[in-house]
Amino acid sequence: MSLLRCRFQALPSLCFCVLVLACIVACQLQMPPGTQSPPPEPKSHWSQVQSKVKELVEPLVTKTRERWQWLWGPGPFQGFLQTYYHDHLKDLGPRTKAWLRSSKDGLLNKAQSLCPRLLCGDKDQD
């Protein structure tokens, strides 16, 4: 049972490592076409692991980028901003003024109720 618990605790770390590797591969794939790649290094165990991970992750990154390309276009983002503005920000000025006015009135009423009658006087005398 404890072995199973250890596996579940290690899962977020593993997912994070895979995500970092995917980002690295994606950044390497986005190099401009005229740039030269670094000279090949002698094959070590680590470079073999790196190349194998790159070979496995590269298709996933490419597919994900192609599937989510519509989200980064100007249409959906602009539509989201317009909807957000109309829903939340369009009448922000009048709402803010009304809130400030009611807050000011509330604070003045509290201050007058706390003020001793000798200093502030009675309201009935005005």
UniProtKB/Swiss-Prot annotation:
Pfam families: APOC4. The keyword Acyltransferase does not apply. Residues 1-27 form the signal peptide. Keywords: Lipid transport, Secreted, Signal, Transport. It is found in: Secreted. It comes from the Eukaryota. One of its GO terms (biological process) is positive regulation of triglyceride storage. One of its GO terms (cellular component) is very-low-density lipoprotein particle. InterPro entries: APOC4 (IPR028120). PANTHER family: APOLIPOPROTEIN C-IV (PTHR32288:SF0). May participate in lipoprotein metabolism. Belongs to the apolipoprotein C4 family. This is Apolipoprotein C-IV. It comes from Otolemur garnettii. The gene is APOC4.
